[in-house]
Amino acid sequence: MRKGGIQDAEPVEPPQSSRKSGTWFAKRPSEMPERHVERAPVRQKINNVGLYKATLYSNIGSFFFGIAVGWSGTAERSVMEQHSYSFQPTELQWSGVCILLTLGAALWCLPMGLMVRLLGCRRTILIQLLPNFLGWFLTVFARSVPMLYAGRFFLGMCGGAHCVVVPIYNAEISTTKKRGAMGVVFEGACICGVIYSFAMSLFLELRIINFVNLGLLALGPLQILMPESPAYYVDHGNIPRAEDSLRFLRGQKYDTRREIDFLTRDPTESEREVRQGPLLGFKYKKVRRSLARSLAIALLQKLCGALIFIFYGLNMLDCLRIRREFGLILCLGLILGFLACFFLVDRLGRRPLLIFSSAGIVFVSIYLGLHFKVWMTMGLTVMSWIALFCIAIFVGCYTAGVGSLTWVLNAELLVRPMRPLGCSIVCAFNWLTAFFVICWFGSHGVKCQPYLFLLFAIIASLILLFSLIYIPETKKLSSAKIQQRLGGLINRPAVITFTSSSDSSNA
């Protein structure tokens, strides 16, 4: 309930001693807590202004990464025609410029899990300012193709790090009622960066745009204002700092005792084992199951095709014989898709959005495939506009579903002790898939081929089926309840033999 901008907090779930409670690791008889009388949870008011600020600060780097991704599509003509640099790359070298962004992201994702465990999300995000500055500095002052390669690789490194750290951070600082909306802001920040790159390319020369992008990095130090995750402070025994962080996120009048008690409860022997070495967590079936589902949805996200429109969207407009200025219609589709996801993810839930958006991609892709087949044989120019609006619907459905929710589910399906390592593996796999997709697309002239869209329809159908069968609904659920729902087919709850990890998002 809201009153005067204040929201009632969902009470923190106290540790349960019943065998029927949602659990993660098997509790042995010696680990069972003593029975005691539980008092009814007391609801208290939460001021979410601090949460919104922390989410905004943490996604500044995501916006920078969106600019770097959008630069790939908007700069091609200027670079290839030698208007912005003293050198002129070949088509193969330009494909390398696009590919190295994804390769840098894939390689830099892997050490992020260790950095998050040791340094925390806040310091890991701040460290990325260095590769971000190096990347744009080399891009702006490139004197050769290898310098441009290096700049794009550094920018990819920074983006890959944010793909790992920001979703983890947003999941740990958010309440269960706000976790979905705060999680999709990451994709929204990237989209804003892409749209910014496209809009700037319509009015300014690439050389000026590069200097403006370099100047935008002055916003990076604002990330110092974001608090560290309370869970990180608790794990390192700094309870006063954890309480300060919670007051920043929930309001100065917020009573932190219940949430701190939940985070500081005694771990089971198996939980202590995983905290000593995350690799030990993979011997548990539900951890492997969560990771497998996250990997599958990450693979399908990059195969679905929207990345092609971002990297080669302007080329597709040329293929349709439409002026590049009308690419703003595609930007409108991205914005509407993100807004739909942002406002509905915590109301409808994750699964309905995945299912409906994937179904929309299937139908639009089939139509586009047939449309391009008819258009190429009949040569009707007016049909190009129909294709443009259909592509806008395609990217809108993608953003409303698998494009945004992949990052949310990546953090939600994994229990907190396994998130740093698990998310780094999933994100590395995600961007490695993007690397191969761009390699394949760049070497084949299939920008307006009907069979390309029919392939996208098949992949979207797989996303639809996978969401129906294997993805549980995680809306407003604690980590323990999410693990409980990770059953077999149709996500039937399995026998409850696992105990929940500490999860600060249960507040």
Swiss-Prot record:
Keywords: Cell membrane, Cell projection, Membrane, Sugar transport, Transmembrane, Transmembrane helix, Transport
Recorded GO MF terms: D-glucose binding; D-glucose transmembrane transporter activity; transmembrane transporter activity
Function: Facilitative glucose transporter that can also mediate the uptake of various other monosaccharides across the cell membrane.
Organism, scientific name: Drosophila melanogaster (Fruit fly)
Entry membrane topology: Multi-pass membrane protein
Lineage: superkingdom: Eukaryota
Protein name per Swiss-Prot or TrEMBL: Glucose transporter type 3
UniProt subcellular location: Cell membrane; Perikaryon; Cell projection
Subcellular location, principal: membrane
Cytoplasmic side: 1-53, 117-124, 174-183, 229-293, 346-351, 396-420, 472-507
